[in-house]
């Protein structure tokens, strides 16, 4: 295969990992969903969740929610 393709894959992977690291710096770390309730209270119509060790505020766009 062309070496340019492998270079592109390596560079794209590096960019994704860098973006993930930068994006995670402003997130609140958590161990359970209860840790995220205060963090998500700044938004409306969201449900707090602890995903991957960080708080996520999930918005239901339809479907089944509990």
UniProtKB/Swiss-Prot annotation:
One GO term describing the cellular component: extracellular region
Location relative to the cell: Secreted
Single GO term (MF): toxin activity
Signal sequence, start to end: 1-24
Tissues/organs with expression: Expressed by the venom gland.
SS bond list: 30-50, 36-55, 40-57
Keywords, alphabetical: Disulfide bond, Ion channel impairing toxin, Neurotoxin, Potassium channel impairing toxin, Secreted, Signal, Toxin, Voltage-gated potassium channel impairing toxin
Alphabetized InterPro entries for the sequence: Scorpion_toxin-like_sf
Family of the protein in this entry: Belongs to the short scorpion toxin superfamily. Potassium channel inhibitor family. Alpha-KTx 30 subfamily.
Miscellaneous comment text of the record: Negative results: does not block Kv7.1/KCNQ1 channels.
Free-text note on domains in this protein's UniProt record: Has the structural arrangement of an alpha-helix connected to antiparallel beta-sheets by disulfide bonds (CS-alpha/beta).
Protein function: inhibits Kv1.3/KCNA3 channel (1 uM of the toxin inhibits currents by 64.1%).
Protein name: Potassium channel toxin alpha-KTx 30.1
